[in-house]
Structures are given as structure tokens and as C-alpha cells.
Amino acid sequence: EQHLSLRRQRQMSIRDRINYSFDNKKIINSFHCHCEDCQRSTGAGKASILVIIKSNFNLNGEPKFYGTKGSMGSTVNRGFCSNCGSGIFSYLKELPNFLFLKVGSLEDSSWVKIESNYFTKSCNEWNMPDEQLKSFKGNPNLLENIKTLIKSLN
């Protein structure tokens, strides 16, 4: 089911140092991640994420990166604007062809439809998950879900 608009998205950082575009018809997944790592990296109760194929992402500018171990032990590389500090996307060493785009970095996010909540076991009372979305206590085997979706696109 297609639930996203057919326009291309464009983002610009606060200081116009970095911009990107992608075709939002090709989004693989969308979720709120409540894991402790996302809570720390965003300074909030969750990160809202769009999963896209790296080849569907056009980047202008040079983000800075820092690497860390994620909640499941994967190597997470987080890209951010070196001028304003805004988080833009992450990628996992174990899934180099996919980007985890921060919804908050979009110029216009009004079209985004989040599908589910991940790591609800890490939620705080002040930031409970949307009960109308599918919820998972941890990561619902994201790697296998992505592989299945890729096969369906081919």
C-alpha cells in the first residue's frame, strides 16, 4: 500500500551547509525508535526514522560522523551538520546500503506516516509510544525485514 506522497523531498540544514533529496516512493520502513542509544543521541524520548536505500539518496555537503555501538551491538555511524549540529542520518556498518534518515531533518515532514514503535521496553512514562501503531519491545528483526522488502522490490 502506498501511503506516502509522490514528490521528492529536499532538506536543508539550518545554515544551508548540507542538503539532500530522495524519492519518498521508495521508503522501506518508518518507525519511532525508543532505544536508549537513540534517546541519548537525540536528547529526546525517541528518534523518528525513515529507512531508505543509499542509492535513493542524493547528498550535497559534507556531514560529520561519529560512531558508536547501538543498543543491539551494531556499529552505528551518525551523520550530522558540523555547523549547527543537526542530526541527518545514520547507517549501520552491518547494513552499508541503507540509511536511517532522521524525520526531523526534513524541510517538510507533514507527509510522513510512521508505521511502528521499536524498543518500547525502553520507553519512559513521559514519552509513551503511540498505541495506534504496531509496537515491538525490541528490534523486530530489522535486517530480515529489509531483506524481504528488497526481494519484493526486484
Where do the model's predicted regions map?
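A short Gly-Trp-Pro
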Residues: 8, 18-154
